[in-house]
Amino acid sequence: MWLDHIKYHGPMRTHQLVLSWIEAELSEGRLTVGGRLPAERTLAEQLKVSRTSVREAIRILEAMGVVRAGVGSGPEAGTVVISDPTAALGSALRLHVATQHLPVADIVETRVLLESWAASKASPQAPELEAAGRLLEEMAAGGLDVDEFLALDVRFHLALADAAGNAVVSAMMGSLRESIQRYAAQLTSNLPDW
């Protein structure tokens, strides 16, 4: 039984049982990206938990960027497994930056470290480097408002991270950029050139 594979760390809330089941199904390959979770009622009956616990687990997984839940009927209905680690990491970092537990300067320093590593690991022929070069040219051309410039800047830095071919570094870079995007926009809008 799937429950036999869960390490016991004390009492578990019922939504955590649902999360553990979904993790086990993903790990074993029975659920994959693009696949659908069983219907809420079916899952609740199968795991012997309330539908409220299933809904809570699904909301948590949505926030983590693991599933997308659609209501109603048709092709968009149901809960589909997705993979968007940047969303969850970015949200968590942004909240911790807002609490001032994670200083913006530390986020920027981490971003620079990861980006430097990614640039050093990238193949000179990586198409992402060519894309980054085009983005730099667009930024240097001028005539951009703050929002346009920042959008190009984000794409430039993400292209550098992607050039290394490391999915974790790419996700981390996206999350780090997202976590300080509001602060960057505030700082940039105060520059005399804009």
Question: Language-model segments: what does each one mean?
Answer:
Residues 11, 15, 146, 194:
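Flexible, glycine- and charge-enriched loops at secondary-structure boundaries
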Residues 107-186:
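Conserved amphipathic alpha-helical segments that form helical-bundle/coiled-coil interaction surfaces
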Residues 43, 82, 96, 129, ...:
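Hydrophobic alpha-helical segments
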Residues 188-194:
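Short, intrinsically disordered, charge-balanced linker/junction segments flanking boundaries
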Residues 1-113:
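Short linear motifs at protein or domain termini
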